[in-house]
UniProtKB/Swiss-Prot annotation:
Its cofactor is [4Fe-4S] cluster. Belongs to the aconitase/IPM isomerase family. It is found in: Mitochondrion. Its EC number is 4.2.1.36. It comes from Aspergillus fumigatus (strain ATCC MYA-4609 / CBS 101355 / FGSC A1100 / Af293). Keywords: Amino-acid biosynthesis, Iron, Iron-sulfur, Lyase, Lysine biosynthesis, Metal-binding, Mitochondrion, Transit peptide. This is Homoaconitase, mitochondrial. Pathway: Amino-acid biosynthesis; L-lysine biosynthesis via AAA pathway; L-alpha-aminoadipate from 2-oxoglutarate: step 3/5. GO terms for cellular component: mitochondrial matrix. Induction: Expression is slightly increased during growth on ethanol.
Length: 777
């Protein structure tokens, strides 16, 4: 139902509203609509609180009340993302305005760790730290492996709790729920702040106007010790919603559709800001926003930020009125909410975005993701025709197992009871697992009767926590089985056997599928007779009554997009600079190799996730030996990898390498295999942080991937020894490829690998680097 013109994805009928987008450049001063497009030749790329001294949990450094004043016109217009980062950046020069691309020293309002708290604590102690810089900044939750009652796991949990008590850190034991949900419902992730976590789904905090982004274990240890860590402000994409969702269409359908329809890495390593008219944004509840923000991770983004608006204000005031504990009430204090909305932080007029995307919500229908990929999204009505039998269904995860989700699933069964006049059960041969996002959300569902409705239908309860979503505990998919889940990630092997098939869908569709035994919906959605496709594409929609409804304002937007287009287009068409004798050479830090050379080992696949690199079943086994890590490296992607790879090989893969979870072992297992360098077409940001922090160098070389696919595409293998030689001269920033004995030799310039990153790697990673820096103090 789509057609492409240039890089604009258009519905097969005229747009209902003007779009500033592609495919041709035109300017009309008689209209508020301006069109801008890239020429075809350009490529688009129960809380246990331990305190040593009494202190308010709302006090951090910088102050949680230091939100920028949006009415004070800055010299440099900023996006909402840039404004929030500005408020939590240390050491900025006087008059400096944070912009995308800046490296900043970030002091987050909060930092959450979960089951990985103990490995983080070991890093914290290894760098020589003895005292947590700001205990109020840290939150610990146990949520991933809560069904594991082994002595080893219980001892680890005990060690985490003891550490929290010793340092006065807020601690939530196993059974209280998924850490991200706790951060939301307990008010730690507060609007207008920066909140990070050592988990890839920190993006979820954007659902409440809090800039949430993932960090990795080493970053978390650094924050514990110093209160800060480095961060590069990503390019920022504005995603504009228009219209409202039809009945039967949910937030899960929105993000599944976005991930599947914009599936060419359009927002890879971007920060996202979701916008829309007042009517549109009011139609999206906070729970809906949390679902969308949560899965911006799977879409490839580093943040997914919703506005600080009236919908959020109503939610906050409800939380303030119903907070039952003193500590929670303090975080949702009326005074704090009043201060926030007395002058809410918004993007400035004229703020520059690197990309503009849009989606008309009214044209959307229920969607299903998979199998085994979030980049494959299919309208439910198409899948229903195939009557795909399922073996397991899951209503789990921080994405979609809040009380509202449980209510939606329960309604499917209640409606079936009303239709049949008698009890209904989960289909024969289907196992339906349910785990609430938190203990508090489960209590709400129980009081409403929704939890019991699912249990009466034969659902299998699991403790509040991550459950099957992380691939741990009861109910994992077995070889050959098919499952459908309301969770966020369906990568191969993520939820059990690599030989199973996993689909993702809304709670309603999961419940209906469990009831019917095949992938199906509850029948609520009715497609309009005049529907001709999903309205989605690149560009900015100009809506009547919006702030872009004068010629002058449209001109400002046109100029901003023109600047962005010229910049990215010139990069796309200009030849890469060669490094000749007159080129500036890079200084080499002692201990860092001047040259890295080896045979190219080609893993011909895009979107290899961290689950593919290092299976989830090993992630929380903290005593896995280096030899074992090397043995299981890439196990989910290619079981034969271990026998093919050799020490010293240059690891080369496709695009969006290292997407998915923030597990550190994805990098350290490659190092354990004695592979000195990872090269890919593009690399996920969180994996990049893990790699550098653990002393694994990286390069992005799209041209090399394209050439390898030209040479070996006719006989595709998961892992191939190519016989090609790869040589990276770090000093001259030059890569030379010898395409096998007697083959072509060619060279390419690559970005300089700066001495500061060399130093971290030469020291053996960020942990050892920080330890060295502390010893200097």
């Amino acid at each position: 139902m789509f057609k492409r013109t240039g890089s604009l994805l258009l519905r097969c009928r005229a747009s209902r509203v003007p779009v500033i987008g592609r495919p041709l450049i035109s300017l009309s001063t008689s209209s508020t609509s301006l069109s801008l497009s890239r020429p075809r030749s350009f490529a688009t790329t129960s809380l246990r609180r331990y305190t040593e001294a009494s202190s308010s949990t709302t006090q951090t450094s910088p102050s949680s009340s230091s939100w920028p004043a949006p009415d004070a016109a800055p010299r440099v217009p900023q996006t909402l993302t840039e404004k929030i980062v500005q408020a939590y950046s240390l050491g900025l020069a006087e008059g400096q305005y944070v912009k995308a691309g800046d490296y900043v020293m970030l002091s987050p309002h909060r930092c959450m760790t979960h089951d990985n708290s103990w490995p983080t604590a070991l890093k914290f102690m290894a760098i020589g730290a003895s005292k947590v810089h700001n205990p109020d900044q840290i939150v610990m939750t146990l949520d991933h492996d809560v069904q594991n009652k082994s002595e080893k796991n219980l001892k680890k949990y005990e060690s985490i709790e003891k550490f929290a008590k010793q340092h006065g850190i807020d601690f939530y034991p196993a059974g209280h729920g998924v850490g991200h949900q706790i951060m939301i419902e307990e008010g730690y992730a507060f609007p207008g702040t920066v909140t990070v976590a050592s988990d890839s789904h920190s993006n979820m905090y954007g659902g409440v106007g809090c800039l949430g982004t993932p960090m990795v274990r080493t970053d978390a240890a650094t924050i514990w010790a110093t209160g800060r860590t480095w961060w590069k402000v990503p390019p920022i994409a504005k995603v504009q919603f228009t219209g409202t969702l039809p009945e039967g269409v949910t937030g899960k359908d929105v993000i599944v559709a976005l991930s599947g329809l914009f599936n060419k890495d359009e927002v890879l390593n971007y920060a996202i800001e979701f916008t829309g008219s007042e009517e549109t944004m009011k139609s999206l509840s906070v729970d809906t926003r949390l679902t969308i923000a949560n899965m911006t991770t799977e879409w490839g983004a580093l943040t997914g930020l919703f506005p600080i608006d009236s919908t959020l204000e109503q939610w906050l005031r409800h939380k303030a009125a119903t907070a039952s504990r003193t500590e929670t009430a303090r975080r949702f204090a009326e005074e704090r909410i009043n201060e926030l909305f007395a002058n809410p932080t918004v993007a400035d007029r004229g703020a520059r975005y690197a990309k503009y995307l849009y989606l008309d919500l009214s044209t959307l229908s229920p969607y299903v993701s998979g199998p085994n990929s979030v980049k494959v999204a299919t309208p439910l009505d198409e899948l229903e025709k195939h009557k795909l039998k399922i073996d397991k269904a899951y209503l789990v995860s921080c994405t979609n197992s809040r009380a509202s989700d449980i209510a939606a699933a329960a309604k499917v069964f209640k409606d079936a009871v009303a239709r049949t006049g008698g009890p209904v059960r989960v289909a024969d041969g289907v196992e339906f697992y349910v785990a609430a996002a938190s203990k508090a959300e489960q209590k709400i569902a129980e009081e409403a009767g929704d939890w019991q409705a699912l249990m009466d239908a034969g659902a299998i309860p699991l403790p509040a926590g991550c459950a099957v979503c992380i691939g741990l505990g009861a109910g994992l998919l077995k070889e050959g089985e098919v499952g459908i889940s309301a969770s966020n990630r369906n990568f191969k092997g993520r939820m059990g056997s690599p030989d199973a098939k996993a689909y993702l869908a809304s709670p309603e569709v999961v419940a209906a599928s469990a009831l019917n035994g095949v992938i199906s919906g509850p029948g609520i959605y009715k497609r309009p007779e005049d529907w001709t496709g999903v309205s989605i594409g690149e560009g900015e929609v100009v809506e009547s009554g919006s702030r872009i409804d004068t010629t002058l304002e449209a001109m400002e937007k046109f100029i901003g997009q023109l600047d962005s287009m010229i910049d990215s287009s010139s990069k796309a068409v200009m030849p890469e600079e060669s490094t000749g004798s007159g080129a500036t050479e890079v200084d080499i830090v002692p201990g860092f190799p001047e040259k890295i050379e080896g045979e190219i080992l080609f893993l011909d696949a895009d979107n290899i996730s961290t689950d593919g690199i290092y299976p989830g079943k090993y992630t929380y086994q903290d005593d896995v030996t280096k030899d074992k890590m090397a043995q299981v490296c890439m196990e989910n992607y290619d079981p034969a990898f271990s026998g093919i790879a050799r020490a010293g090989d240059i690891f080369v893969s496709g695009f969006n390498f290292g997407c998915g979870s923030s597990r550190e072992q994805a990098a350290t297992s490659i190092l354990a295999k004695q592979l000195p360098l990872v090269v890919a077409g593009s690399i996920g940001n969180t994996f990049s942080r893990n790699a550098v922090n653990n002393a694994l160098p990286l390069l992005e070389m799209p041209r090399l991937i394209e050439r390898l696919r030209e040479a070996f595409g006719s006989e595709k293998q998961p892992t191939r020894r190519t016989g090609w030689t790869f040589t990276w001269n770090v000093r001259t920033s030059q890569v030379t490829v010898q395409e096998g004995p007697g083959g072509e030799t060619w060279s390419q310039s690559v970005p300089a690998f700066p001495p500061n990153l060399q130093d971290i790697i030469a020291q053996g990673g960020l942990e050892k680097w920080v330890k060295k820096e502390i010893s200097k103090a």
